[in-house]
Amino acid sequence: MAPKAEKKPAAKKPAEEEPAAEKAEKAPAGKKPKAEKRLPAGKAEKGSGEGKKAGRKKAKKSVETYKIYIFKVLKQVHPDIGISSKAMSIMNSFINDIFEKLAGESAKLARYNKKPTITSREIQTSVRLVLPGELAKHAVSEGTKAVTKFTSA
């Protein structure tokens, strides 16, 4: 997105001032200069020197979130309650934060014990270290239950 005409950088080079001066001469007094025609994003002119193949769409970056899982848990606990997008974003950030803390603590534990692999034991210990009291106990029991279910299936 191009900056507005009113905003000017503190120090301009002489080469940057010339195109702006040319545009000002072309436009009649009191009228805005006409916008240049632009092609839709991803479509280049035939004569342009871009190395992209014509007709290819730009791939979207996939952003992984916990939103669908948060929503599923919410509906299990309170089927009649919804959640705003801002609250969902906060919950997603919260889960990412807890995940990073647990992963960091697990990595430290593996390094201390000179082990190359993070196992369920390191995860369980890091949960006990990161989460407080009763919350850690419930998290450990739910985690153990999930691992048992996964290995038996």
UniProtKB/Swiss-Prot annotation:
Chief place where the protein resides: nucleus
PTM note: Can be acetylated to form H2BK6ac and H2BK33ac. Monoubiquitinated by BRE1 to form H2BK143ub1 and deubiquitinated by UBP26. Required for heterochromatic histone H3 di- and trimethylation at H3K4me. May give a specific tag for epigenetic transcriptional activation.
SUPFAM superfamilies on file: Histone-fold
Residues carrying N6-acetyllysine: 7, 37
Basic and acidic residues bias (residue ranges): 1-28, 36-53
Region (Disordered): 1-61
SMART domains noted in UniProt: H2B
Subcellular location: Nucleus; Chromosome
Entry-linked CDD domains: HFD_H2B
Disulfide bonds: none
GO MF annotation list: DNA binding; protein heterodimerization activity; structural constituent of chromatin
UniProt keyword terms in alphabetical order: Acetylation, Chromosome, DNA-binding, Isopeptide bond, Nucleosome core, Nucleus, Ubl conjugation
Positions bearing the Glycyl lysine isopeptide (Lys-Gly) (interchain with G-Cter in ubiquitin) cross-link: 149
InterPro entries: Histone-fold (IPR009072), Histone_H2A/H2B/H3 (IPR007125), Histone_H2B (IPR000558), HISTONE_H2B_site (IPR055333)
Gene Ontology CC terms: nucleosome; nucleus
Record function comment: Core component of nucleosome. Nucleosomes wrap and compact DNA into chromatin, limiting DNA accessibility to the cellular machineries which require DNA as a template. Histones thereby play a central role in transcription regulation, DNA repair, DNA replication and chromosomal stability. DNA accessibility is regulated via a complex set of post-translational modifications of histones, also called histone code, and nucleosome remodeling.
Entry's family note: Belongs to the histone H2B family.
Assembly, per entry: The nucleosome is a histone octamer containing two molecules each of H2A, H2B, H3 and H4 assembled in one H3-H4 heterotetramer and two H2A-H2B heterodimers. The octamer wraps approximately 147 bp of DNA.
Protein name according to UniProt: Histone H2B.4
Organism this protein belongs to: Oryza sativa subsp. indica (Rice)
